[in-house]
């Protein structure tokens, strides 16, 4: 990307891993908390990286950024997570320049989501953009790229039906409960964790189960109380967790902690219990599988569920791809203009210097020289010359490099390459 005069880093990379090759455990090793994202960005800045975005969801962790070599970004990820380079190499992907651009469009528009048409990732991209911008880590390229991805995402939402129907991890969990549990409205349901996934799950539970026995527990009680107040639900203290699990028929875990919050010891083994773990890393310990009366389902299983809604969405993929191609092509055309932006800027400066020298010469020769009119006329001439050069460079992409070289040679624009 050095030809585009955008970053000190030679190339634009996407490095990351997703549900496609990395299971929940490995994704958990590479998941980033809000604090670790911040520390990663601060280190990137210290190391001279001038353009970088970081996202981490239950389905993927990715870094988009400029670097001399992708290992700069891989090293940052491994240093701020529990993952190793060896683990990363087995399941990861690395995309460079145009491929990296294509990938972020695919991800940001929901076509690469574990549940087709789930647009949660676009909000994560927006948050990542704001976080990086606050640290001065968003260059012109990243700003334009993220805005283009947001534009494509909006158009796909508005012009296709790829996101119609309730389909998300939170909805899939409720759908699973409805399919596998009889008389759901009579069961005691405990929701542990009231972050974004927890809130969405709570709304879907209330809407689809008609259950009046839903209890919320969160480490920070006031968060649970705000949600409970909206739906008239019960809130219990975190200290009551074990007792509430014992009273429950269904336990939904959406705590988002870095280590398991539910272990075998917390569960009463003689009662049937369905546990849905919606967290990455896994928040329910694997030893829970040893309990005969307990059925543990992780979000990866829920995300694989297909229903009529998902099948219906697939027919809109070609239309969505057309929109992406259109917006991505527009972005790439803008990117090509970055190639000649420094030359155009240097040419304008050169013409202005030539103009000033000539006006000074004429001013000395002509006694009644009209400075104001001369400035207006000469500036308009420069403007027209610049427009012709710019139009030529935009219109003939195949010979852009040769044209730039000729302009730089004719007008002696040595500063462009400095």
Swiss-Prot record:
Binding site for substrate: 57-60, 113, 118-120, 124
Catalytic activity, EC: 1.2.1.70
Entry's family note: Belongs to the glutamyl-tRNA reductase family.
Subunit (UniProt): Homodimer.
Other observations noted: During catalysis, the active site Cys acts as a nucleophile attacking the alpha-carbonyl group of tRNA-bound glutamate with the formation of a thioester intermediate between enzyme and glutamate, and the concomitant release of tRNA(Glu). The thioester intermediate is finally reduced by direct hydride transfer from NADPH, to form the product GSA.
Keywords: NADP, Oxidoreductase, Porphyrin biosynthesis
Site feature location: Important for activity: 103
Active site, UniProt feature: 58 (nucleophile)
Keyword Oxidoreductase applies: yes
Pathway in which the depicted protein is active: Porphyrin-containing compound metabolism; protoporphyrin-IX biosynthesis; 5-aminolevulinate from L-glutamyl-tRNA(Glu): step 1/2
Domain notes from UniProt: Possesses an unusual extended V-shaped dimeric structure with each monomer consisting of three distinct domains arranged along a curved 'spinal' alpha-helix. The N-terminal catalytic domain specifically recognizes the glutamate moiety of the substrate. The second domain is the NADPH-binding domain, and the third C-terminal domain is responsible for dimerization.
Name used for this protein in its record: Glutamyl-tRNA reductase
Keyword Oxidoreductase: yes
Catalytic activity field: (S)-4-amino-5-oxopentanoate + tRNA(Glu) + NADP(+) = L-glutamyl-tRNA(Glu) + NADPH + H(+)
